[in-house]
Amino acid sequence: MERKSYSIDINRIAQYAMYAYCIFALFSLAFSVCRQAGLSFRTSPILIPISPILVTIKQLVLQLTPIALWGIFRFTLPAGVKLLRRCSELMVLYYVLSFILGQCFKFNFVTMMQNGQITPTATILTWIQSSMGLISVIASLVAGCHLCSKHRGNMRKLGIALVLVFIAWLLCSNLLPVAVFYLAGNTQQAAFTCMNLISMITTTSTYIYAYYRMYRAIKTTGCIGQ
């Protein structure tokens, strides 16, 4: 694969983005596990005043770092790999759209409820976000399969990681909830709690591994900072 050269240290930016994502993804996982267990960081006198700040920073980091990593990965790809470029562009578009819509809903730029009903605008935007989410999952799977079959080394490992992300999404978001709903019976509440814990740990682990492999692939695809 032809290597590309850049005057700015994109490799360092990707490294910082990857580290930031890993740190705050683990923080988010710990926060969610504590909440599932009935604990709260807000019970600590030290963390009471900074908890809202940490949560805000966590949300911003987890929303923005994927944009940075996928964007850098896209621009380090050679011109000949058009399929990977299109898949990467779809991923960037999805994360940018999710960030914008998230801010619109958070700051009430879009009216969610009116007279006890969801507004048509909110319905359309939610549908667009869900559709883009499904498209991004498919794009990630296509990119992963392409990398596994056409490349070697770090690029192939990234492909495996992207396929694992799809498998985790399929299991944790689709198959496990249905299985628990139909099989748990009278123990549904406890089963859903266990399922949520398993899903959070699995999803967080696969995404951390995928973005680590993406950082390694970025180093492979370009002489960054030279």
Where are these regions (language model features)?
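Interfacial non-cytosolic loop connecting adjacent transmembrane helices
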Residues: 35-51, 106-127, 176-198
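N-terminal juxtamembrane cytosolic/stromal segments of multi-pass membrane proteins
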Residues: 1-17, 215, 219-226
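C-terminal transmembrane-bundle signature of multipass membrane proteins
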Residues: 27, 86, 146, 164-226
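Alpha-helical transmembrane segments of polytopic membrane proteins
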Residues: 50-64, 123-137, 173, 192-204
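Transmembrane alpha-helical segments of multi-pass membrane proteins
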Residues: 12-22, 82-99, 158-171
